[in-house]
Amino acid sequence: MNKIYQEALDALNNHQVIAFPTETVFGLGVFYDDQKAYELLNAVKRRREDKPYTMMLSKVEDIFKYADVDDKYLKVIKKYMPGSLTILVKSKDNVPGYVTHNTGIIGIRIPSNKEALELLAFVKKPLLVPSANRADQIPALTSEEVVAIFGDEIKVVVHGQIQSGEPSIIIDITGPEMKLVRKGPIPFEELNH
C-alpha cells in the first residue's frame, strides 16, 4: 500500500484532490493548509463555499494541536475516536481562516478505517475531507463510483472498503452543553450522558 500512499502524497503536494475510503463513505482529501487545493476541492464538489469541510487526523493527541477542547469532553473523545464521530471544536490559530469560514470552529474526525488511518499517518498532515460526491448528490461507496463521478478530476484513488455507508454523527462541543448537529451511527444519548 505504501506505493499508493506515496502517489497520494505526491498529488497532495501538487495541490491535487485525492479520494480514499473511510468507515462511512469514500472521502475526498486535500491538505488543510493548501488554499489552492481547497479552491479546487470546492470546484470538484461544485459546492457553495458556506459549508466548512471536516478536518481528518490520524490520532487523538493531534486534536489538541489544532483545537481547544474543554476537558469535560475528553472522555467522549477517547472512547469514540477513532470512529464515526465528528466533533465541532474551537480551532487554534494554526488553522487557516478559510477552513473555518472565519468562525473559529472546525469539525474534526479520526476515521477508524484502516486505509484512511494509514494514509493520514503516511502524509503526516491533516486533510480536509468531505464525502466523495458532487453537492447534493449521494456519496460514493466504492472506488469505482468515485471514478464514475469524478473521472480524472481526482488524481489518486486509494482502494479499500467502507463499513457502513452512513455519515458520522456530528456533535458541537464548543460550549458548556454538548449539542447534536447531525445524527449518525452512534446514538446521541450514548455520547451525552
Task: Identify the function of each model-found stretch.
Residues 1-193:
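Active-site-adjacent structural elements in enzyme catalytic cores
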